[in-house]
Amino acid sequence: MPRSLKKGPFIDLHLLKKVEKAVESGDKKPLRTWSRRSTIFPNMIGLTIAVHNGRQHVPVFVSDEMVGHKLGEFAPTRTYRGHAADKKAKKR
């Protein structure tokens, strides 16, 4: 369910300050953040943001199609290794 238009998009203040500083200085170093809940804004386009997935920081290069989505959508938290093989079929 989307957020109310009356409230507007959410972004953590500390992340917004980091983004503005990086855009102002032209720095291309990845910005480390734990804020998976923050919305991607248009001024983030072209930046690499390292989003924490619970274990490590996953680098996410922000493109124009990502604007409006949350940072956490691009850093998966669960690893799927597949279902266990069928032991009966393996023996034959």
From Swiss-Prot:
One BP term from GO: translation
GO molecular function: rRNA binding; structural constituent of ribosome
A Pfam family it matches: Ribosomal_S19
Highest taxon, organism lineage: Bacteria
Gene3D superfamilies found in the cross-reference section: 30s Ribosomal Protein S19, Chain A
InterPro entries in the cross-refs: Ribosomal_uS19, Ribosomal_uS19_bac-type, Ribosomal_uS19_CS, Ribosomal_uS19_SF
Keywords tagged on the record: Ribonucleoprotein, Ribosomal protein, RNA-binding, rRNA-binding
GO cellular component: cytoplasm; small ribosomal subunit
Role: Protein S19 forms a complex with S13 that binds strongly to the 16S ribosomal RNA.
Family: Belongs to the universal ribosomal protein uS19 family.
NCBIfam families reported in the protein's UniProt record: rpsS_bact
UniProt-listed HAMAP family: Ribosomal_uS19
Protein name: Small ribosomal subunit protein uS19
Species of the source: Pectobacterium atrosepticum (strain SCRI 1043 / ATCC BAA-672)
